[in-house]
Curated annotation (Swiss-Prot):
Chain's gene name: ctc-3
Organism the protein comes from: Caenorhabditis elegans
PROSITE patterns: COX3
GO cellular component: mitochondrial inner membrane; mitochondrion
One MF term in the entry's GO annotations: cytochrome-c oxidase activity
Designated name of the protein: Cytochrome c oxidase subunit 3
Subunit and interaction comment: Component of the cytochrome c oxidase (complex IV, CIV), a multisubunit enzyme composed of a catalytic core of 3 subunits and several supernumerary subunits. The complex exists as a monomer or a dimer and forms supercomplexes (SCs) in the inner mitochondrial membrane with ubiquinol-cytochrome c oxidoreductase (cytochrome b-c1 complex, complex III, CIII).
Any one GO biological process: mitochondrial electron transport, cytochrome c to oxygen
Amino acid sequence: MFHNFHILSLSSYAYNLFFASAGMLSSLVMFFKFGLYELFIFTLFSVLFISFAWGKDIAMEGLSGYHNFFVMDGFKFGVILFVFSEFMFFFCIFCTFFDAALVPVHELGETWSPFGMHLVNPFGVPLLNTIILLSSGVTVTWAHHSLLSNKSCTNSMILTCLLAAYFTGIQLMEYMEASFSIADGVFGSIFYLSTGFHGIHVLCGGLFLAFNFLRLLKNHFNYNHHLGLEFAILYWHFVDVVWLFLFVFVYWWSY
């Protein structure tokens, strides 16, 4: 019987990703509580590996002609819902931040940021990271417009991936040199929760871009059919916008 839906073949990726994600969240709690980071690193890479394997299968389905326009509309709606859920996640984090910052309690000295904390200078490493991330947004947009014009976008994609890796490296360096930890009161908790989860999103977004760059090298995309790359670019711009809010409020306004 003819229909517009693509009937999926049997796959264990959904179950594997569920258990790997549950293990990652559980190991994250253990890391916060006991400082055991090895299991978290293992489960994080398990999630990334399963996601790449699943994405490869989806890409092969598209190349085989199973993804008609009706199916692609479903993908678009799913990605919009996913980005909206990510937006709500960071919205909750910012609600927590403003609840603590606008009405600081007596235990914090009734001031924000808490008295006695040596914070990161926003016009040092954070400003550099802002320039790097915004530059990566420019280069990935350059790559997109080059592809739409049926031109080569290899150099701009390589530059975007390098900037993403550079941002992650500088963020790790900032954590190692910071004078406070996640256990230093409400500010330390919110700071590392917000910037840490954003860093994970940058890592995932950079890998997503790298995955699509490999597909680009294999000629999986053309100027009018590159949905996977568009999803990666949309996600990357979302990461850019979240960082701007983090820089303005968590770094600059709190300093």
